[in-house]
Amino acid sequence: MLPSVPTQVPIFRRPLLALGFFLCAKLILAKAGGSFLLPAVTTGVPGKAAFWLLIPGVFLLLVITVTDFEQRLIFDDTTLPLAVFGLVHSIALSCAAASYAPLLKNLFAAVAGGLIFLTLAYLTRGGVGGGDVKLIAALGLWLGPERLTAVVCVGFFIGGLAALLLLLTGQKKRKDAFAYGPCFTLPAILALLTGIF
């Protein structure tokens, strides 16, 4: 069963939705030949396909950010399409480069990242959830090993800092659940759109 959708958008969700529209607008404007944040669209059908696939990818990452904030859950309804779009994106990149290297690297990142987080989920006994495992595997298909490693490191740093602040301010206790998903999705969006990592 799909999660219920609230009839009114919570006040803190509105900036995230506005950010999503802004990022998609930047993607569209970049097609004209590049912008402050984004490079120009690669020529050729595969390159253009890889570019336009960023739009559903970013949208799904924003949805995951919101749902994990709200419900402490990352749904298969979003991670599965994210993985599918990521696989198609990897194939398009390989076609544009006339090489299997991008696809193979991204597949390796997905498998390795998923296995590492699956191990963490077992060792932490629920500290890392199944949704986080699937999210990292899906991100591997988009980012490849180098950028996925950077995003995970940044995510752990941001998450650890945020958790520490919540503990120090008394808003969270040590055994309380903490939404780590946004700590990975937001750096991933930056990586996809700016090449910052």
What are these regions (language model features)?
Residues 1-197:
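A membrane-topology feature that recognizes alpha-helical transmembrane segments
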